Amino acid sequence: MDNTDEPQKKVFKARKTMRASDRQQLEAVYKAKEDLLKTTEVKLLNGKHENGDSDLNSPLSNTDCTEDKREVNGLVDSNEISEIKRPESRAESVVSDLEPKPLSPVNVTREQDTDVALVCEAENRVLGSNKVNFHEENNIKNRLDQRESDTPSGENKSNCDNSFSPEEKGKTNDITIISNSPVEEKKKAGEIIVEDTVGEEAISSSMETDQEPKNERDGTAGLSETVVEKAVDESSESILENTDSMEADEIIPILEKLAPAEDEMSCFSKSALLPVDDTAPDLEEKMDNCLSSPLKQESNESLPKEAFLVLSDEEDPCDEREHAEVILPNKSGLPEEVEKSEEEDKEREVVHKEEEKHTERGEVSRRKRSKSEDMDSVHSKRRRFVGEEDYEAEFQVKITARRDVDQKLEKVIQRVLEEKLAALQCAVFDKTLADLKMRIEKVECNKRHKTVLTELQAKITRLTKRFGAAKEDMKKKQENTPNPSLSSGKAASSTANANNLTYRNITTVRQMLESKRNVGDSKPATLQAPVSAAPASSLAAPQTPASGHPKPQTPVTSSPLTTTVISTANTATVVGTSQVPSGSTQPMSVSLQSLPVILHVPVAVSSQPQLLQGHAGTLVTNQQSGSVEFISVQSSSTVGSLTKTAVSLASTNTTKPNNSPSVSSPGVQRNSPASAGSVRTTLAVQAVSTTHPVAQTTRTSLPTVGTSGLHNSTSSRGPIHMKIPLSAFNSTAPTEPPTITAPRVENQTSRPPTDSSANKRTAEGPTQSVKVTGSDSGGVIDLTLDDEDDVSSQAEAKKQNQTASTAQSIPTQPLSRPLPPLQPNPLQQTGVPTSGPSQTTIHVLPTAPTTVNVTHRPVTQTAAKLPIPRTPTNHQVVYTTIPAPPAQNSVRGAVMPSPSLRPVNPQTGSMTVRMPQTTAYVVNNGLTLGSGAPQLTVHHRPPQVHAEPPRPVHPAPLPEAPQPPRLPPEAANTSLPQKPQLKLARVQSQNGIVLSWSVIEVDRSCASVDSYHLYAYHEDPSATMPSQWKKIGEVKALPLPMACTLTQFVSGSKYYFAVRAKDIYGRFGPFCDPQSTDVISSQSS
């Protein structure tokens, strides 16, 4: 009691922690003690606190309820007397609250309530000491001690768990938030607890609280003791929790100052400090404020001011909230409990005062908190803590208990505060860690996205460069090839092929596509336009004239063809021109016009050029282009153009020897119009017939041509042939032509299956599919026809270089990159009879066969042979041997009758276009090859490479090693230098290639190496000669592995590198396997 008096006299204020609002609240509380008592009306919280029983609000509500009940029951007197009794009942309710609360935020609130109850119990004990409660106080102390252990573990846990919960509750309950003036509320709570021990019970159950307050008031000592004991136990627990959460530093000094009531103060401060206490005060205050300021006022009045310890740590609102949200509330709670314990006697007065203060203060806090904490709602306190808000802990510690009790309480409070603080710190740390993890995850996710974007952009850039380079190469090759083609009729055909090749080469896939687009729009019209017009439009001027008469121009046309491939109209023109040179018939140009359509379909520029060129003069080209293209032709517009073209071609063709096929073609072509394939086929046939009659005779395209009707069928069969071409194509030209023709058409449709597979094999799959006929045909054709002999592909590539030389070359290059893999297929396919066809078989073959078959039945047969024997095929073999292109043709062309073949090629071109395989042959042989070859060539180029020693054609044979003049005797005991293993890598800057070489195992029997000689080979669509291997450097031997970096390359080109060792005796070791790299791409093959 004395102790209580002392604490009443002392008001401790923490400088920092005291909020302005808290001070105001304190002042208001002091001023409005009586008013606070009046606030009993705020029983509204009873409902809340009843609900609050289950939830956070319940503690607050209960507290308020208790207060309300106190006020109702006779706030001041009742509070004083009831405080003793009520503390018991309240403690009981608090106990019940506390027990359930630990599980949930409500637990925290309940803990707070419990703390309050404990305070009440402490007060009750004080009163009990005065009355009978003193004995109870001892019991309470004992229980507090017990509960200290229990509560710390249980409630502290709940505090830890609910470390947010007390504050959350406080926050949740604006009332709790009001706890900002925890001191007031604590005092209030103390008094409320004392008075409203019943009230706390009310917290458990408002009804109970009401009854209990009265009962407890009536049942003084007994209930008090029991309740007080329970309350003390619970308060100990709360206190422990609060102590944990509360900062011991703050609490201890205050407790020490409050030494007289240290025990109760300890309990109280602990509870106050504990989140529970804070929550309890907050809850009580808030509940009081929310339920009824009067209750709080009552509570405050009831609570003696004696040990009004105000820890303004911003327990509720601020600092401690952040760090020890729970702790601060506990702090306030503990002080309250301590207060309550101390205050028992004077708590009534203090409680009244405090209640007033709390009410005012609670109201003020409440406002503050409601605004700040309302956001979080009733749970805002805890959430706030979670939200890292600052908490103010106000501790009103009124210790009315004896010193021994005070000491015990102080210890309990310290322990509880420590535990609570630890819990709060853990919670803060966990939350911070979780936030950090989230941020890290976001950052990593962003990094991944950026990386993916960067990679995609880099790939796009590389592809763009590659296409640009391929385009340039194709243009250069085209320019180069046209000249040769101009050289002679054969040359012209060759040129046409070369042009086609060049065109192809020039037209990288991209160019082809672009051209195609251009052509696509203009193509139908262009095609429809007179063949001459189409050629004219195509490269139009040159081609038209070429188309008109000059086969030499045809080469040009070829180029245009290539161009045409690029643009539909051009394609047509080109084809026409090419064919003119090939067939040396304008019909061819007409075919070309048709071709454009076909070419257009092929989309694959390279194949189109090939097709165009292959068809150069005829629908064949279209067909060839079009296996897929053909389909395009078959498309109504395409058909229309084709039809017109076909007719024109037919007439033109008719004029020409091949005209017979042409004538048939016309009819057929008309049919073709219906089926673009037909027209193309016809054209191709015609062209083939015309030119090929001679050249293609071999082909027997003529038979096909002869079978103009066949052609029609061919066009329709084109697809069939396509499929057949692979097999049939190889098997029978004559039959195939028609088949091919039909297949051709199918080719476009069907050919996707056959040709398309081949085509797809060819790099362009889909595009090629479309252009498969053309593209695959071209490539395949070249390959197939050419490759029909294995080399054929490669040869074909070269042939294409000749025929499609330009066109093919370009396509080859462009395609070559993509196609390399395909080319192998073609090669392999080549191996296979259907290889060509397979190539798509080169759709061209099927198409060509169709066209060629129609035009060149022989060709088809040849094609058939070629596919099977590919090499066996005369033309194909020839083609295989040499790319159709004149230049390459020379090599391969040599095999093929360059002149006739070339002419055939033009025709074949048409035919070739028609039948991918035949075309392939044709292409291989001549322009057709080129036309067909363009794409195929591209596809086949790698095969070509393979054809050459290391690679078909391309890596040309490596130069022979010169023999040293004479060897010293010691050299006889040593073997030649070992064969190095070469690896290529790209420098990130994209402007350098790193060559690194080593040996798998060091052979001791070899003489020491003096130097390494580096050779480079620039892939050229023209004939591949060993002389093309150039020595680029000599490096003094160093311990392996060695490496050097080469720079200054022509972008878009393909380079092959080889290394060989020279020993100290001047002997050269074997070359390493040549390695190639595409300067456009960052990959080395």
From Swiss-Prot:
Residues 1-22, 47-109, 127-245, 329-381, 469-499, 517-560, 650-843, 889-910, 932-975 are annotated as: Disordered. GO terms for cellular component: nucleus; transcription regulator complex. Residues 82-91, 133-150, 347-379, 469-479 have a biased composition (Basic and acidic residues). Residues 446-480 form a coiled coil. One of its GO terms (molecular function) is transcription coregulator activity. Disulfide bonds: none annotated. Residues 976-1082 form the Fibronectin type-III domain. Belongs to the MCAF family. Recruiter that couples transcriptional factors to general transcription apparatus and thereby modulates transcription regulation and chromatin formation. Can both act as an activator or a repressor depending on the context. Mediates MBD1-dependent transcriptional repression, probably by recruiting complexes containing histone methyltransferase activity. May belong to a complex that represses transcription and couples DNA methylation and histone H3 'Lys-9' trimethylation (H3K9me3). This is Activating transcription factor 7-interacting protein 1. It comes from Gallus gallus.
